[in-house]
Design a protein with these regions (language model features):
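Charge-dense, helix-prone N-terminal extensions
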Residues: 1-114
């Protein structure tokens, strides 16, 4: 199980990441584009995914971890429960979301160092 502090630590290790408030909750940005936001409940993370099909697949495969709400219908955005995701998986989710929003050059530099 990860905590808000774990999410913050993992997100802020990604290049160019800053933390700002979005809708009154912590959110993480890369070069001005958000890639993760902690929901008001404090134990759910909002993340973009590559496509709505991937969102549907995550929810169908692991509904204890991933879900959505009507607000996100029609959007390639999934919600992840902190309590159902370990730190390694959360790091992977954040990195994938970061890659979706990061400038291509920054992502390429990151991948070259990995």
């Amino acid at each position: 199980m990860v905590t808000e502090e774990d999410v913050r630590r993992l997100a802020l290790t990604l290049p160019g990441t800053t933390e700002k408030s979005m809708y009154g909750t912590p959110a993480f940005y890369v070069r001005g584009k958000w890639f993760a936001r902690i929901r008001e409940e404090g134990d759910v993370l909002v993340l973009p995914v590559p496509a709505e099909e991937e969102k549907a697949g995550l929810i169908a495969a692991e509904p204890a971890k991933f879900f959505t709400t009507p607000h996100y219908d029609g959007h390639a955005i999934v919600l992840a429960r902190f309590g159902a995701v370990d730190a390694e998986e959360m790091g992977e989710l954040l990195t994938e979301a970061w890659r979706l929003r990061a400038p291509k050059r920054l992502a390429a530099e990151f991948d070259a160092r990995a």
